[in-house]
Amino acid sequence: SANYPLGNYPLSAMCIHLDYKINNHWQLQYSLYNGLAHKVFEKGNNVFSICPSQEGIFNISELSYQQNRTYHGLYSGGFTIHNRLYSNNENGEQTLEEKKINFSGWFYLEQCLFKKNQKEINLLAQYSANLSINMGCKRYTGFGVTLSNIVFSSKENTLGTFINCARYTYGREVSYELTWKICMKKNFNLQPAFHLINNKEGTFSIGMLRASYT
C-alpha cells in the first residue's frame, strides 16, 4: 500500500474481485482495480471511475494453500501489475512517475509450531519485493509469533509480537509491535498494542487500544 495509493482512506478505487476455491486446500483470488484512486465526495472525483487508457489498471493475483492438520498452516504467494506508478517522496507526498509497467511479488506464511491441549504457538512471516521503482518501498520483510495459553491461562488471551523492516529507496524503517488480546466476555475482546518505529528521522512510539465484538 506504500507504493499503490488505491485503497488507503480517504482514497478509493473501483475494483472487480474474483475468489475461486479450487478444493479444500487451494484457493485463487484475483482483483482488478482502476489504476488511479479518487477521494470520496470531492467535487470532480468519481470513485466509480473506470478509465484504463488514462488512469491505468492495477492487478493483484494470489494463490494460497491451507492445511487443516494438527499443525495447521496457511501459505500464499502472489504478484501485482500496475501501469500507473505513484511513489512516496521524502516528505511523504505522492508523486506521479512516468507511466510504465510495474511488477511486485510477495509470499505470506502462517504456521503452527506447537499445539498441545489448549496451548498453541504460531509463526507468521511475509516478504515482498518491488525492484522496478525509482522511489518508494523496494522490499518488505516481517516475522511474528503468537502465544495462546502459554503465558496466560486461557486460549482467548493471546500474546503476540511482530517485527518488520521496510527498505525504501531513501532509507530503511524498522518497527516492532507487542500486542495482547484480552477476552473480557464471551463475545467482547480488548486488545492493547504498543508500536516502536525507527527510521532516519529518529525513534517513535505509538500506543493503541482496539475493541471488538463478535
Each model region followed by its residue ranges:
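Surface-exposed coil loops of outer-membrane beta-barrel proteins
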Residues: S1-F58
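Short loop/turn motifs that connect adjacent beta-strands in outer-membrane beta-barrel proteins
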Residues: H25, Q67-Y75, F114-I121, N149-L159, ...
